[in-house]
From Swiss-Prot:
The keyword Transcription regulation belongs to this UniProt entry's keyword annotation: yes
Protein source organism: Chromohalobacter salexigens (strain ATCC BAA-138 / DSM 3043 / CIP 106854 / NCIMB 13768 / 1H11)
InterPro entries: Integrase-like_N, TACO1_YebC-like_2nd/3rd_dom, TACO1_YebC_N, Transcrip_reg_TACO1-like, Transcrip_reg_TACO1-like_dom3, YebC-like
Locations listed in the record: Cytoplasm
Protein name: Probable transcriptional regulatory protein Csal_1845
Length: 249
């Protein structure tokens, strides 16, 4: 079981930007609220909520804040109704982009998202134009030094989908969304604490970006979308070469 993860550089970049802008907490609270509203407040029965809690704790959110968000979503406290929506489009060079949003005003959100696409050489597509290119998975990045054999022994009973080797030699465990929590628990029981983990949308195939100017245009689109208050996550099939990433840093 071997492969290559091409999205790690963008995930890490996005996390750093969100933290820098101070927006990560508001996005995490919304995810906790909606996850508990849709699947209930019991973590054992709600893989999405488990993933949201893990991400909130990793970003140093207090347990009290997490619990309040869960209670709000589960209906124990009053709060504004948030609606989930996904927008699909294409960026420069035909890069496929999925934008996950939570909003209390669809008209405002679609207008903002459309503006970001049009201002950066892209266009907002129709429903289904891009989504078929992506699939939902859980991914857990393991610490350096963990062997594939050790990872397999630790997680086999939890039924991961795959274990892939990333460009830097570290391992990434791939799971279905439903098995994400079980696989993470199995790793922790084996004293293997993932350095990063999430459930997200990943492309079936990638569009290679090999020149710096195109990369800048694509990343500018990502930045503008991520700056929008209603946007939770931005996913893309862009694959930036190591040479391009080095020039951009």
């Amino acid at each position: 079981m071997a492969g290559h993860s091409k999205w790690a550089n963008i995930k890490h970049r996005k996390a750093a930007q969100d933290a820098k802008r101070g927006k990560i907490f508001s996005k995490l609270i919304r995810e906790l609220t909606v996850a508990s509203r849709q699947g209930g407040g019991e973590v054992a029965d709600n893989p999405r909520l488990r993933a949201a809690i893990d991400k909130a704790l990793a970003n140093n959110m207090t347990k009290d804040t997490i619990q309040r968000a869960i209670e709000r979503g589960a209906g124990n406290t009053d709060g504004d109704e948030m609606e989930e929506t996904v927008y699909e489009g294409y960026g420069p060079e035909g890069v496929a982009v999925l934008v996950e949003c939570m909003t209390d005003n669809r008209n405002r959100t679609v207008s903002d998202v459309r503006h970001a696409f049009s201002k950066n050489g892209g266009n907002l597509g129709t429903s289904g134009s891009v989504a078929f290119m992506f699939h939902k998975q859980g991914r857990l990045t393991l610490p350096e030094g963990v062997s594939e054999e050790t990872a397999m022994e630790a997680t086999l009973a939890a039924e991961p989908e795959d274990i892939v080797t990333q460009a830097d030699g570290t391992l990434e465990v791939v799971t279905s969304p439903e098995r994400f929590g079980a696989v993470k628990d199995a790793l922790l029981e084996a004293d293997i604490e993932p350095v990063a983990s999430d459930v997200g949308l990943y492309p079936d195939n990638y569009t290679s970006i090999d020149d710096v100017e195109t990369a800048r245009k694509v990343l500018k689109l990502f930045d503008m979308l991520e700056d929008l208050d209603d946007v939770q996550n931005v996913y893309s099939n862009a694959d930036f070469s190591d040479a391009v990433m080095a020039e951009l840093e």
